[in-house]
């Protein structure tokens, strides 16, 4: 992304530096990209990590799934009140919980499919075949279909399967053709099941700048360089709070939309171990973060400082210089421990 010119930044550099420092205390940051009005105001990676090497996303990948559902809905090939099994009869096991008949596309999007556990990447990758059939064979909580939030990446994989069936292309193929290529993003990979469907809920490979760019696409209601890549109506619906996340009250992120998390002031995509896309509803700012430490406080910290930074006076030259110096010197600390004796070093090294 283009760099914002010095002196034109809206965000106060001193407060932005405070945010970076507090994030470092809270999480093992790997990389970050802060965009203001679609232009970079801070980006970097903590050595030995690099902005040029994509990392595997966990649930942040669900953003891509939601964008693809939006494409199918916009073309009239999928409707949110359709029943899931309208598209999956050929995937059903011989015996199954008949409460599956009640689950809609909307329920899958909002994690209200009556799941009794989270079928995550570990659960799925233990299977050598029949991912969808196996997931459909699990017991459901009938009373909570459509009215109880239970996070389950199986919902996301199922959406990926359904989109592929109705669109005739995988989610990755759709994104490459309609989104990534138009944004000049390089080759992006996404893991697939043995059946050839993208995993939906995890497995997309991104860098912090690419995360921020996708966040900016959402912030711009699906518009990129004057071209509508994804329906503005869908983007608006996607980031609306739909269901309260249990035990999240008081945090910047407290609700769930369509495969993304939401709050009063921000929308967000979050992946395990501190992967974040954070977009501000009323401020033209988006942040992409990768890290190695799970922490729900990351979004809280970003919201706190960005709201302060936009209200603060213009940055001084001293503040800008300090921020640039920090950007140039990012490095993870060496782990604690005693020096290895030389003879042991050579023994291990061989």
Pin down the residues of each PLM region.
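Active-site-proximal loop and beta-strand segments within enzyme catalytic domains
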Residues: 3-4, 9, 14-21, 54, ...
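Active-site Gly/Thr loop motif
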Residues: 235-286
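Short, gly/Ser/Thr-rich active-site loops of penicillin-recognizing serine hydrolases
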Residues: 297-350
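Catalytic-site signature segments of enzymes, centered on catalytic residues
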Residues: 51-52, 118-204
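Active-site-proximal alpha-helical segments within enzyme catalytic domains
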Residues: 155-162, 200-223, 275-292
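Active-site helix/loop module of the DD-peptidase/beta-lactamase fold
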Residues: 75-113, 166-202, 206
């Amino acid at each position: 992304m283009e760099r914002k010119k010095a002196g034109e930044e809206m965000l106060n550099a001193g407060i932005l530096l405070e945010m970076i420092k507090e994030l470092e205390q809270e999480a093992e940051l790997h990389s970050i990209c802060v965009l203001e009005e679609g232009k970079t105001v801070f980006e970097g990676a903590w050595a030995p990590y690099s902005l040029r090497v994509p990392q595997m996303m966990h649930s942040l990948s669900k953003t891509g799934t939601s964008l693809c559902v939006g494409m199918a809905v916009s073309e009239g090939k999928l409707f949110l009140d359709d029943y899931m099994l309208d598209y999956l009869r050929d995937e059903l096991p011989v015996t199954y919980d008949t409460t599956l008949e009640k689950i809609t596309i909307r329920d899958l999007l909002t994690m209200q499919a009556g799941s009794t556990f989270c079928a995550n990447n570990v659960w799925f990758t233990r299977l050598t075949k029949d991912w969808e059939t196996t997931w459909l064979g699990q017991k459901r909580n009938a009373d909570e279909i459509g009215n109880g939030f239970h996070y389950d990446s199986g919902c996301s994989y199922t959406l990926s399967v359904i989109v592929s069936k109705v669109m005739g292309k995988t989610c990755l193929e759709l994104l490459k053709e309609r989104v990534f290529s138009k944004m000049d993003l390089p080759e992006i990979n996404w893991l697939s099941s043995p059946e050839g469907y993208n995993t939906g809920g995890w497995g997309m490979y991104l860098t912090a700048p690419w995360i921020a760019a996708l966040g900016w696409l959402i912030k711009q209601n699906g518009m990129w360089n004057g071209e509508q890549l994804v329906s503005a109506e869908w983007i608006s619906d996607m980031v609306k709070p739909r269901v309260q996340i249990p035990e999240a009250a008081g945090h910047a992120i407290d609700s769930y939309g369509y495969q993304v998390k939401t709050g009063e002031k921000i929308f967000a995509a979050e992946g395990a171990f501190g992967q974040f896309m954070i977009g501000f509803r009323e401020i033209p700012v988006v942040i992409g973060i990768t890290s190695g430490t799970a922490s729900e406080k990351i979004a809280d910290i970003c919201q706190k400082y960005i709201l302060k930074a936009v209200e603060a006076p213009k940055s001084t030259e001293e503040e800008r210089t300090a921020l640039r110096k920090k950007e140039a010197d990012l490095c993870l600390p060496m782990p604690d421990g005693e020096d290895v004796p030389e003879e042991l070093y050579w023994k291990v090294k061989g």
